[in-house]
Amino acid sequence: MLLGFVGLGAVVETAYLPAIRNLFPDTPRCLGFDIHPEKQPEGVTRCASLGELLSHPLDTLFITTSSLYHLEVLEQALASPASRIVVEKPIVATLPQIEKLKALLAQPGAADRVLALDHWMARLDSVKQSLVAHVSDIVKIEGFLQEPSGYNAEGEPIALNFATGEPDARTLRHPDGVILDIGTHVLAMLRETVRYMDGSDDITLEVVTAKDRLGREIAMGDLTTAEGEAHLQGSISGVPVDIWLNKYAGPAGGQKGLRFYLRDGRIVSHDRRGAEDVLELIKGKEIQRWHIPGTIYEHCLAEHILGAKSLFERDPHQVSRTTRRRVEEVTLLLTLQQQLRGPH
């Protein structure tokens, strides 16, 4: 197996490569290219150019650059022989890019080659355990991504790397706030779960609150400051939804997943705790609990991307449909940004 990576930043080093090593006793050969020559993670053979990387007979190409450059790389990848192209979330970063993306995917033979990835779309254990029979059994859904954070010398909250827990040295700017950057995770998990419960893709959302890293409201016309936390509200398949996003939720963080409130009074909770997912069926003081070990990237790569059971193998038509859903979600979140900040 020959894998290629365009963009060799932290997500490759701390998420993809460890997951690949854990999944395969004989680690696949990995090639990569990055415009920054200092980025050379162990286990990846660097190519001198993107063209050189694309000239190899890659089994799967991963586009893992910053989101603003996904479209540019994807256009070149589609012009290459690469038959399986996986684009990290969000697949694009602006509304004008959405229109260009749709034109690219409309080219003959393109859509079935491109999978828009959000690794949270593999978190379907509430469906696998058959804890909710049908979306009509649900009266309310809550989605959460409340990330642990640290503090700088001034006592201000700072972001932490999601995989290592080390301080994130990046200065986050719009559009890399929580609405687009991590809201994609919650929407992907939410929509895939509801879809398997025979729900529809219909979704509406609005911004209730959005604040920066220091807790100040995002002002209309501010096209620079990233949101540090946000509360989104709406519905999916007719069910009321509240989504809570926070990149600065304190040293312990908070819930990372979904809670389904059922008509019979029970609650289904799907959370990420340490190195495992935890699924709970709550009925008063009685709690049934399931533990799902392994990183989310391991589950996603094993179940959707690589190997004989990948989505490309078991259901090729779902590749383009999955990408369409991820594009719809990004479009919705980018539209919320327009409403929050003004046209831009």
Enumerate the predicted regions with their spans.
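N-terminal Rossmann-like dinucleotide-binding module
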Residues: M1-G43
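Short beta->alpha connector loops
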Residues: G9-V11, S66-Y69, I91, M121-R123, ...
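A short helix->loop->beta-strand "cap" motif at the edges of active sites that frequently abuts
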Residues: T27, S80-R84, A110-R113
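Beta-loop-alpha module in the N-terminal Rossmann-like domain of NAD(P)-dependent dehydrogenases
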Residues: E42-V86, P90-L104, S130
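A contiguous active-site-proximal alpha/beta segment in oxidoreductase catalytic domains
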Residues: T60, I91-A159
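C-terminal helix-rich "cap/oligomerization" subdomain common to oxidoreductases
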Residues: T60-I63, T209-K211, A302-H344
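Rossmann-like dinucleotide-binding domain that binds NAD(P)(H)
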Residues: T164-P240, N246-A252, T331
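NAD(P)-dinucleotide binding in Rossmann-like oxidoreductases
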Residues: M220-E229, Q233-H304
